[in-house]
């Protein structure tokens, strides 16, 4: 085969992923406009961003679709750290810091996002669910009615980030003293 033959061949198409594409389609049918964005890595992983008001409905839809294992639930503060990165050289002047927020796979529009990982143990497929949490209303609906195991995850997220969970029966602190002020995992 000559170099000319190689240059004229069409590039190979990326493989499809019918299983994960089907999950996206089913969730879109269930929550409609509540599905905001997706990031599919064929035959590897799936990230889905939903609207804040569709957070619990998305969990219920995925649970009904066979996602029987609740892995974790937490939040992330996408604000760039005012202290730099841990690998910055302390002997050098500090690098210029950016204030641009980058939300990772499936995008985002707010500083805080909820993250949760669910797995369908029969089909051996997982999905990471994300939801933007508006700065002026730091709360989402609790997942306890859908996944009872979300209880302490939500308590920890509330304690560390200050995000509320509508319908949660008991948002007492787990780690910090009752009189502790502030939220340790916020970057401000």
Indicate where each model-derived feature is located.
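Terminal low-complexity/charged segments
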Residues: 1-188
């Amino acid at each position: 085969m000559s170099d000319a033959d190689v240059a004229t061949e069409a590039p190979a198409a990326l493989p499809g992923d019918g299983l994960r594409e089907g999950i996206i389609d089913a969730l879109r049918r269930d929550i409609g406009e509540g599905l905001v964005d997706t990031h599919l890595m064929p035959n590897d992983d799936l990230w889905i961003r939903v609207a804040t008001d569709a957070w619990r409905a998305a969990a219920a839809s995925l649970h009904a679709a066979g996602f029987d294992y609740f892995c974790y639930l937490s939040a992330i503060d996408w604000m760039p750290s005012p202290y730099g990165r841990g690998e910055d050289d302390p002997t050098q002047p500090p690098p210029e810091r950016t204030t641009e927020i980058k939300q990772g796979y499936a995008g985002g529009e707010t500083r805080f996002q909820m993250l949760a990982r669910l797995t369908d143990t029969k089909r051996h497929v997982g999905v990471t669910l994300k939801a933007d949490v508006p700065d002026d209303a730091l709360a989402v609906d609790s997942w306890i009615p859908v996944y009872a195991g979300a209880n302490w995850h939500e308590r920890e997220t509330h304690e560390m980030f200050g995000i509320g969970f509508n319908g949660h029966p008991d948002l007492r602190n787990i780690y910090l003293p009752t009189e502790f002020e502030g939220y340790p995992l916020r970057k401000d």
